[in-house]
């Protein structure tokens, strides 16, 4: 089951609330850090606009753009996999695989981030968890552990996501 998910089906649906509002609602821990406006960042036209300062969010603190981008990447992926669709995923992780500064035709400087996302269906996660626990974590069983890793690799879902950030408001 290499990749039963078309990553386009994970995109935030049209008509969904703006990221600034919905992410602050679903993830209150970041409500005082999310100095963004704009879209979900799927392309230049939908870029996330990053601010180092936002009086409405937190008038006492300035943020660096890179940290805000990482926060946004993490929580957009969580929004896509936990809230925006009927199907939920678990064991979701991501790793940055690329970064590029792009000068748009409109004169705007964009930060284009590429990440690899890995996740599991709940059924695959439960299967792997039960296998691991029923074999006591394969303690002292290297062959069994290798077999478990093969089972994990068969069930993992991998895909690449791109994030576009308008960084004009964080330039010195």
Predicted regions and their residues:
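Cysteine-centric segments in proteins
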Residues: 2-110, 116-172
């Amino acid at each position: 089951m290499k990749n039963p998910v078309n990553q386009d089906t994970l995109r935030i649906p049209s008509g969904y609330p703006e990221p600034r509002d919905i992410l602050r609602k679903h993830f209150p821990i970041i409500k005082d850090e999310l100095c963004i406006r704009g879209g979900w960042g799927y392309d230049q036209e939908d870029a996330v606009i990053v601010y180092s300062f936002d009086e409405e969010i937190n008038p006492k603190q300035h943020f660096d753009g890179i940290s805000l981008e990482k926060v946004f990447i993490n929580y957009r992926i969580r929004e896509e996999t936990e809230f925006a669709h009927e199907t939920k995923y678990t064991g979701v992780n991501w790793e940055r695989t690329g970064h590029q500064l792009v000068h748009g035709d409109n004169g705007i400087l964009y930060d284009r981030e590429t990440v690899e996302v890995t996740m599991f269906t709940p059924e695959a996660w439960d299967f792997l968890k039960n296998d691991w626990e029923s074999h006591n974590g394969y303690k002292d069983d290297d062959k069994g552990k290798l077999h478990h890793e093969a089972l994990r690799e068969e069930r993992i879902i991998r895909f690449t996501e791109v994030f576009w950030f308008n960084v004009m408001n964080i330039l010195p």
